[in-house]
Design a protein with these regions (language model features):
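Cell-wall polysaccharide-cleaving catalytic domain and substrate-binding groove, primarily
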Residues: 1-138
Length: 138
């Protein structure tokens, strides 16, 4: 089975190009013109964490339904399917307050998003732990 674009790019949330993320593959080595390509999955997951934290602080997004609607725009995604997938994976109702400041819950949420975006979740807990540690240095 071929790897998904997000897994190949070490960008499991398929973050569009634009921001100068830590760990970006530099021009000349980057073959994807639409999505960021990072040097390791930890850096792609780090970017996910930073985006989730920004959205929580800037837009007060504290529920799975709010978080997913913001990151999976209905014009290009099946937002309901993404919400349902993340709810099932986390075991948390879509409109319950989510503690994204808790590293355990954040890891569960990240794994659910990665699985939905890529059809698989290939990363071990160690990758998520390193990504969360890297996100602390933003």
């Amino acid at each position: 089975m071929a790897l998904s674009r997000g897994i190949r790019n070490n960008n499991p949330d398929n973050i569009l190009r634009g921001e100068d993320w830590k760990g970006l593959v530099r021009d000349g080595q980057d073959t994807d013109k639409a999505f960021c390509r990072l040097i390791a999955p930890e850096y792609g997951i780090r970017a996910m964490v930073i985006i989730l934290r920004r959205n929580r602080q800037k837009h007060n997004l504290n529920r799975i339904s709010e978080i997913i609607r913001r990151r999976a725009h209905p014009d290009k995604n099946d937002t309901r399917a993404c919400i349902d997938s993340v709810v099932q994976a986390t075991g948390m109702p879509a409109d319950q307050l989510a503690d994204t400041g808790d590293s355990g819950f954040m890891t569960t949420l990240l794994k659910a998003i990665v699985r939905h975006e890529n059809g698989e979740q290939p990363y071990g807990d160690d990758v998520f732990a390193r990504a969360l540690a890297l996100a602390g240095d933003q």
